[in-house]
Regions:
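Sec-dependent N-terminal signal peptides
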Residues: 3-14
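OB-fold and OB-like single-stranded nucleic-acid-recognition modules
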Residues: 20-148
Length: 148
């Protein structure tokens, strides 16, 4: 009986941790600063993200995040798209939000486009080297529990 109660408690706490992670992930991802670095190809200095330790700790980890699928030219596939903390009219590409509020997504299975908030689960990769890509990349993504 003790083992059953202990197992149930651990299971419930783990579920709470994922929910808390989902709620705070975009907030954590906003903990960045920038430094200027010379880009050889462009011939001038560009802003490069400097990730906080909290963000670095998430590198390569499976995370769950809620947000909106952004229809962006060049990301037409249902397995490759941009994901935003905010709806399309408020996201980074339409003004107002910063680059830390969007991520590139590569999914395992095609994910149907929706204008509603959806939840994704995948492995987070950080990008501070390639200025032609977003700073956050979610790979092996799939719809998370409680997704709409």
């Amino acid at each position: 009986m003790r083992t059953l109660l202990l197992s149930l408690s651990i299971f419930l706490l783990a579920g709470t941790a994922v929910q808390a992670q989902d709620t705070n992930l975009w907030k954590t991802l906003s903990k960045i600063t920038y430094e200027k670095k010379f880009d050889e190809l462009l011939g001038f200095k560009v802003d490069v993200p400097v990730f906080s330790q909290d963000i670095q700790d998430l590198e390569g980890k499976v995370v769950e995040v809620s947000g909106y699928i952004v229809p962006v030219e060049g990301y037409k596939s249902h397995t490759e798209f941009v994901f935003s903390a905010y709806p399309y009219n408020m996201c980074f590409f339409c003004g107002g939000a910063g680059p830390e509020t969007v991520m590139e997504v590569t999914s395992v299975e095609p994910i149907k486009y929706s204008t509603e908030r959806v939840k994704l689960r995948g492995k987070l990769t950080l990008n501070s080297d390639d200025i032609n890509r977003l700073m956050y990349v979610l790979t092996e993504a799939e719809m998370g529990k409680g997704a709409t």
